[in-house]
């Protein structure tokens, strides 16, 4: 039977922070313990529960650009529902290890995340997703959150401009979660490995991770451009 959890990400961080103030409660329940650390632009935490281990690192690599690395090492079937009220944001997601199913609330849409594909998405308004993974899965997930203003500055093109690679893929007026699957290329796989194995600390670490996240965004946008060019050049029957 799945261990169902329903919470907001901010609630989870509060719960982890509070748990550090009551270590005696954790001593009474050794199967459930946690650690939490906030340092500079990086927040990391780790939670041990009968369902398994769950860890997260979130880094603000620059204004408008967030990198997170999530890991699940599951002992039981697991279902996690996350509900958020979100400002407009583009997301790039890569399941580096393991696999899991994501369902989008309010629609029949769902997708399976695994190392062969990445996902480009656009979020705004009420966003509710449910992630399901089976016992025994060891999932590693790398996610990028990009403010539309930063993406516009990086590409020197508004997202609704005809030449922008995301124009026509996502609706700026539709609320919820829109997404599109993208093949993970060898170049993307190398950049992901370098993010996970970052050898630096402090300011050097932040600059290095910023360069790798921007590289991933560039590779994804290039693939979108190539896909659109291929569609436009295909003969109509």
State the predicted function of each range:
Residues 30-140:
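N-terminal functional module of multi-domain proteins
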């Amino acid at each position: 039977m799945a261990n169902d959890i329903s919470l907001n990400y901010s609630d989870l961080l509060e719960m982890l922070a509070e748990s550090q103030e009551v270590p005696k409660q954790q001593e009474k329940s050794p199967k459930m313990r946690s650690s939490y650390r906030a340092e500079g632009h990086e927040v990391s935490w780790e939670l041990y529960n009968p369902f398994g281990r769950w860890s997260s690192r979130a880094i603000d690599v620059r204004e408008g650009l967030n990198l997170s690395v999530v890991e699940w090492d599951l002992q039981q079937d697991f279902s996690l529902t996350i509900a958020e009220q979100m400002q407009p944001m583009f997301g790039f997601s890569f399941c580096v290890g393991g696999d899991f199913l994501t369902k989008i609330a309010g629609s029949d849409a769902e997708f399976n995340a695994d190392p062969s594909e990445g996902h480009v998405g656009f979020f705004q308004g009420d966003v509710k997703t449910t992630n399901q993974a089976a016992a025994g899965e060891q999932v590693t997930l790398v996610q990028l959150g990009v403010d539309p203003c930063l993406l516009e500055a990086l590409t020197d093109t508004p997202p609704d401009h005809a030449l922008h690679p995301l124009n026509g893929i996502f609706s700026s007026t539709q609320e919820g979660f829109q997404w599109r699957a993208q093949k993970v290329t060898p170049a993307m796989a190398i950049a992901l490995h370098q993010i996970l194995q970052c050898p630096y600390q402090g300011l050097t670490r932040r600059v290095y991770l910023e360069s790798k996240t921007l590289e991933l965004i560039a590779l994804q946008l290039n693939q979108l451009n190539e896909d659109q060019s291929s569609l436009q050049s295909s003969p109509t029957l």
